[in-house]
């Protein structure tokens, strides 16, 4: 069936919260329904399109702005976009949201206590941050501003990835006749 609805799912949270894990699972779930999806992962963007950016507050805001612009282009091309990046600042997320029509920007707060994220530390970044090697690391040397009213709030320390995906899927603006298996 023809896909009618496109939107962006914007996963935000500290490093190690589970954004990439959930983004990949969500993509699999939507792909299985025959929907056209595109995943914008923060690490991939930082190694490509945004490789010229550092980690100053201004550069972090620019990272979010560029990602929102790419997401908008992908939506215009008919894709459901899944963006997974820390995006630590409320004002920058708000500006990203403003690029999209009402109801097409679904903010997902991937919430985890900092100590849990540090214990997970899949990339070894928290250790480096605590040693001073990454002075502006989000959650340690730079603030992460929790979303005030995200469309979806999942807590990955208490909830399994599959339960988180089920919660996210319930909030997506999917047409009932789109991509039905």
From Swiss-Prot:
Keyword Manganese: no
Family: Belongs to the APS kinase family.
Active-site annotation: 87
Keyword list, A-Z: ATP-binding, Kinase, Nucleotide-binding, Phosphoprotein, Transferase
Protein source organism: Burkholderia ambifaria (strain ATCC BAA-244 / DSM 16087 / CCUG 44356 / LMG 19182 / AMMD) (Burkholderia cepacia (strain AMMD))
Protein name per UniProt: Adenylyl-sulfate kinase
GO biological process: hydrogen sulfide biosynthetic process; sulfate assimilation
Molecular function in Gene Ontology: adenylylsulfate kinase activity; ATP binding
The protein's role, per its UniProt record: Catalyzes the synthesis of activated sulfate.
Pfam families: APS_kinase (PF01583)
Residues noted as binding ATP in the record, renumbered to the chain: 13-20
Annotated Gene3D superfamilies: P-loop containing nucleotide triphosphate hydrolases
Highest taxon of the lineage: Bacteria
Pathway the protein takes part in: Sulfur metabolism; hydrogen sulfide biosynthesis; sulfite from sulfate: step 2/3
Recorded catalytic activity of this chain's protein: adenosine 5'-phosphosulfate + ATP = 3'-phosphoadenylyl sulfate + ADP + H(+)
UniProt-listed Enzyme Commission number(s): 2.7.1.25
